[in-house]
């Protein structure tokens, strides 16, 4: 028989088939994308609406609200991303999706804590759970792109992250227009309930891939072998 030739990565038919298997037909890619949608809603709800939400629900001055929103991202968020990355490598065997599950749990707990704090408490005390929300939600915000690149492999990471980005920025339909409508109709405190709903949805979505491998290179190798066998027939 003819000698089987290894598939060339520049082969257009192979690349198209690879994208179908590792990206468009890969359930993990879609779970990560939907999770990103929920994560971005939580993040932007507090980042974009914080200047309105804090004065209306906690009686905080606009000046102090500005400081808290800045600290939300630059202190809580940046610290959360670093710790989440460390935890992924050291505690979860490079399984970023598992780190994200715990981050979403933390987000839910801290959102409840912040929501329940009475407006008589000092704003500087309130700032602690508020920054901790950022600490937890910025973990997935940073890690989901890494998880996507690992699952789609370097051959398809750009396409997969493009999908992830579309879902992330589609979240503005909720965190932008949707939240404004909800605040007008049901009051500013209802925003916390909305944030909790989407945080829980993000958690539940991520738990469906808890057992997933750290990356998709094993699946990619298997696909390439199958493609070579089929091509040689």
Show which residues each predicted segment covers.
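Juxtamembrane intracellular "pre-TM" segments in multi-pass secondary transporters
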Residues: 1-32, 225-233
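Extracytoplasmic gate region of multi-pass secondary transporters
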Residues: 26-82, 141, 145, 175-176
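Interfacial helix-cap and linker-helix signal at transmembrane-aqueous boundaries
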Residues: 54-55, 87-88, 92, 179-187
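Cytoplasmic membrane-interface "Motif A"-like loop-to-helix N-cap segments
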Residues: 89-104
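Paired intracellular helix-loop junctions of major facilitator superfamily
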Residues: 93, 148-157
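A membrane-interface helix-boundary motif in multi-pass transporters
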Residues: 95-98, 180-198
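C-terminal ends and interior cores of transmembrane alpha-helices
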Residues: 105-119
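A late C-terminal transmembrane helix in Major Facilitator Superfamily
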Residues: 154-185
């Amino acid at each position: 028989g003819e000698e089987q030739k290894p598939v060339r990565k520049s082969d257009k038919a192979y690349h198209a088939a690879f994208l179908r298997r590792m990206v468009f037909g890969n359930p993990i890619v879609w779970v990560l994308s939907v999770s990103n949608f929920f994560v971005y809603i939580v993040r932007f709800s507090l980042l974009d609406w914080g200047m309105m939400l804090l004065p209306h629900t906690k009686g905080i001055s606009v000046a102090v609200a500005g400081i808290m929103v800045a600290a939300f991202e630059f202190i809580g968020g940046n610290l959360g991303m670093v710790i989440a990355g460390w935890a992924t490598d050291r505690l979860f065997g490079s399984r970023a999706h598992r780190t994200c599950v715990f981050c979403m749990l933390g987000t839910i707990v801290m959102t409840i804590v912040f929501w329940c704090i009475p407006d008589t408490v000092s704003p500087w005390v309130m700032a602690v759970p508020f920054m901790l929300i950022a600490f937890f939600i910025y973990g997935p915000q940073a890690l989901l792109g890494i998880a996507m690149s690992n699952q789609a492999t370097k051959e398809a990471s750009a396409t997969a992250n493009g999908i992830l980005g579309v879902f992330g920025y589609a979240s503005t339909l909720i965190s932008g227009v949707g939240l404004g409508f909800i605040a007008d109709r049901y009051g500013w405190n209802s925003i916390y309930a909305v944030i909790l709903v989407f945080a829980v949805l993000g958690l539940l979505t991520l738990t469906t891939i808890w057992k997933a491998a750290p990356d998709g290179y094993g699946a990619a190798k298997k696909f390439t072998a199958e493609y070579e066998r089929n091509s040689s027939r």
